[in-house]
Amino acid sequence: MMNKRIFLSPPFVDRAERAEVDSAFDSGYVAPCGPKVDQFEFELAKLSGRKYAVAVSSATAALELVFAHLKVDKTWIAIVPTLTFIATVSPACRLGAEPWFVDCDSTGNVDLKLLDKALADAAKTGRKILFVAVDLFGRCCNYDTIEKLCRKYKAKFVCDSAEAVGATFNGRPAGSTGLAAVYSFNGNKLITTSGGGAILTDDKKLADHVKKLSQQSREKALWYEHKEIAYNFRMSNLLAAVGLAQLSKMDKILKAKKSVREFYGRCAEGKHLELLPKVEGENNWLTIMLLRNSRERDSLIKFFEAENVETRPVWKPMHLQKVFKGCRVYGGKVSENLFSRGVCLASGAGLTEADFKRIAKVLDDFAAERK
């Protein structure tokens, strides 16, 4: 009989979520908007150190709303780290922007020297510039330097902190940088609302506009009056209830995720296995192991799959995706190397001692065959 599936990063839920959802049902607010959404937004603003938070249906939706507010179109250049999930760049592309990709450094986050070069080249074109930073795998990029570079080249700076809820950079919370930042509450993230996202900002005009855009941009009138084309992206009151329960246990989840990384560190010792270098303040959303080459990467994934343990390669760089063939890229070799060698390991906050033993045995067996 097959062992139970150990998932990559499943939600960490218990009765607290059900109690919050029951409370939302009892209130009669089951549609988008409602007191749970208001409360969730208040807590998110506090968590991120921002003045405003707007809860929406996904981080992808959150980015598109921000870009729509900025009026991103085909006259814009969107500079994006190449090592990321496609949702970082796809909203800007849908609005018509031309994507330029920038390689990462050894941590997986954007290479600052290459970013400087890309921004300088974009500035020479005279076009409007958008830079979308990424806090990759729950590790914040260098907020201070990126803020300076974007000011220098007059680029609009938005931060994709989808993977980094609870992380920090030099004591600053993830999501505290840029004109706006976004969080993800997808089912695999550090905290979840089943599906959802949020926009974090200190700009009241932006916050008010994206909230309006997320609700079909309905005007304040007795009838349905609209002055712009918009979206239906607002978060449900029920999902916000789940989010509130998740926030209440975030410290526990962060502690568990840190323990998972430490476990893998112990497993790697003496086996010539390597983890992606630790970054101060990371939330340890996923632990990444680096193998010698793509053959070993695929072999380790197969070893785990044979024992019903979910793992997967790190993000395939955007400049290698067929949909972006021919797009400008600065560097690329570092992200290509991480993609060819990196495996995202099972990193759930609810892993049991039995789960850890199963995972450790797989790594032992892999290391023994690898020699």
Feature names for model-found ranges:
Residues 1-30, 346:
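N-terminal "arm"/small-domain region of PLP-dependent enzymes with the aminotransferase-like
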Residues 30-77, 91-95, 101, 172:
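Phosphate-binding glycine-rich loop
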Residues 35-42, 50-54, 113, 121, ...:
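PLP-dependent aminotransferase class I/II
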Residues 64-121, 303:
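Conserved PLP-anchoring active-site segment centered on the Schiff-base-forming lysine
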Residues 90-92, 149, 238:
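Hydrophobic/aromatic ligand-binding patch that stacks against planar heteroaromatic rings
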Residues 95, 152-153, 307:
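Helix C-cap/helix->beta junction micro-motif
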Residues 107-193, 198-200, 205:
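Active-site phosphate-binding strand-loop segment of PLP-dependent enzymes
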